[in-house]
Regions:
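Basic, Lys/Arg-enriched alpha-helical interface segments
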Residues: 1-64, 81-84, 98-105
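Enriched for short, Lys/Arg-rich terminal
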Residues: 69-105
Length: 105
């Protein structure tokens, strides 16, 4: 069973920005990127605790996890709240691994 999911408004902009860049590189590549992001989100919603811990609170509890996208150097970072998965950021893992950590909710 999968958790319902939403994207933080800035995560939506993350996807759009990367989609535009990939589309400029090669038509259709942006669409493949969006499919890869969607697949990562579905994986996370099915197995929310399987993602790699990404951010911890002051007590050492996992606050956010991350899952890589297949075929692209991007990952999604998400948190699980109230039986829902919230995608907080979609980011390039090599360029800015701490991108979006200041997004609270």
């Amino acid at each position: 069973m999968s958790l319902p999911f939403t994207l933080h408004s800035l995560a939506e902009l993350d996807v759009l920005g990367a989609w535009e860049w990939y589309e400029q590189q090669q038509p259709g590549l942006g669409d493949r990127f969006v499919v890869a992001v969607g697949a990562a989100i579905v994986r996370a919603s099915r197995w929310p605790n399987a993602g790699t811990p990404a951010i911890h609170d002051d007590n050492g509890e996992v606050v956010e996890r991350r899952v890589a996208t297949a075929g692209f150097p991007y990952a999604i970072r998400y948190r699980v709240t109230d039986e829902q998965l919230v995608v907080m950021a979609v980011y390039h893992q090599r360029r800015r691994p701490d991108f979006g950590v200041d997004r609270l909710s």
